[in-house]
Amino acid sequence: MVNVPKTRRTFCDGKCRRHTMHKVTQYKKGKESRLAQGRRRYDSKQKGFGGQTKPIFRKKAKTTKKIVLRMECTECKHRKQLPIKRCKHFELGGQKKTRGQVIQF
């Protein structure tokens, strides 16, 4: 389990050019546009008779995705993305573990 704090003091490569506080969120893929060239080509190819025209990918190899942190500078609002390692469980701003304490569920 990876636990990342909601704020982080790191270098801002926008206007600030110095270490500032950044607000951390997890990157999420946006909604795909129906007007993108590949999507338009695929839709026109699929039209009419002839069934599925392109192969549907079924040989999935990975069980996890790489976590990408999206950091926004609190001063100039410049955003940057930071990929971290693969993990099955990711937590943002969870409780910090303390030494010698019993874990409660």
From Swiss-Prot:
Statement: the UniProt record of this protein carries the keyword Glycosyltransferase: no
Skewed-composition ranges (Basic and acidic residues): 29-46
Top-rank taxon: Eukaryota
Recorded GO MF terms: structural constituent of ribosome
Single GO cellular component term: ribonucleoprotein complex
Keywords attached to this entry: Ribonucleoprotein, Ribosomal protein
Region described as Disordered: 23-52
Keyword Ribosomal protein: yes
One of the GO biological process terms: translation
Transmembrane segment boundaries: none
Family according to the record: Belongs to the eukaryotic ribosomal protein eL42 family.
Protein name listed in UniProt: Large ribosomal subunit protein eL42
Organism: Brugia malayi (Filarial nematode worm)
